[in-house]
């Protein structure tokens, strides 16, 4: 059975209160593609690794898509009305401004594919930690990996330069 069209503007107005930290992300459809509306602000320091492409459409406000491009950290600004297709396997960290709203479309993962979360040292860009996992639910599969990284001084300490990667305030207690 076909799903009726969604009035995206009406959906955003009805759910705007959910598009805020700490998650700021709501899946509106999932059938072959994962279609999400994402609100800002956010303060992500992780990089997402997806074996498929991701399509970004900035509806309101601005965002910066931080990417790791062949070992170099780079910023890609995406403004309201702009779209950007991120190629597969490019680690990326969406940084969304307060009040911003974006639409992100990813294809559902193939059975043999894994998603990843990576962290890089903000001082020297050395990869600190990477976790790969089969993605089942984008809203619930990420938080345990965030918890593991942010609660560990060992994982957050750069082996190259010794810098301690900062953790969000909600991770005030660490397990190491």
Swiss-Prot record:
Disulfide bonds: none annotated. The keyword Oxidoreductase applies. It comes from the Bacteria. SUPFAM superfamilies: RmlC-like cupins. Fe cation 1 binds at residues 48, 54, 92. Its EC number is 1.13.11.6. Binds 2 Fe(2+) ions per subunit. GO terms for biological process: anthranilate metabolic process; L-tryptophan catabolic process; NAD biosynthetic process; quinolinate biosynthetic process. Fe cation 2 binds at residues 121, 124, 158, 161. It catalyses: 3-hydroxyanthranilate + O2 = (2Z,4Z)-2-amino-3-carboxymuconate 6-semialdehyde. Catalyzes the oxidative ring opening of 3-hydroxyanthranilate to 2-amino-3-carboxymuconate semialdehyde, which spontaneously cyclizes to quinolinate. This is 3-hydroxyanthranilate 3,4-dioxygenase. It comes from Xanthomonas euvesicatoria pv. vesicatoria (strain 85-10) (Xanthomonas campestris pv. vesicatoria).
């Amino acid at each position: 059975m076909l799903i009726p069209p969604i009035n995206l503007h009406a959906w955003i107005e009805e759910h705007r209160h959910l598009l805020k930290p700490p998650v700021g992300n709501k899946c509106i459809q999932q059938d072959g593609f994962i279609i999400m509306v994402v609100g800002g602000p956010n303060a992500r320091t992780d990089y997402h690794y997806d074996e498929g492409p991701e399509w970004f459409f900035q509806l309101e406000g601005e965002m910066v898509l931080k990417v790791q491009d062949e070992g170099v950290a780079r910023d890609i600004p995406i403004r309201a009305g702009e779209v950007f297709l991120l190629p597969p396997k490019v680690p990326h960290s969406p940084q969304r401004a307060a009040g911003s709203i974006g639409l992100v479309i990813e294809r559902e993962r193939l059975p043999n594919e894994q998603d990843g979360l990576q962290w890089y040292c903000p001082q020297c860009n050395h990869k600190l930690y990477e976790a790969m996992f089969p993605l089942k639910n984008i809203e619930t599969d990420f938080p345990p990996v965030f918890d593991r990284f942010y609660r560990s001084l060992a994982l957050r300490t750069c082996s190259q330069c010794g810098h301690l990667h900062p953790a969000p305030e909600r991770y005030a207690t660490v397990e190491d």
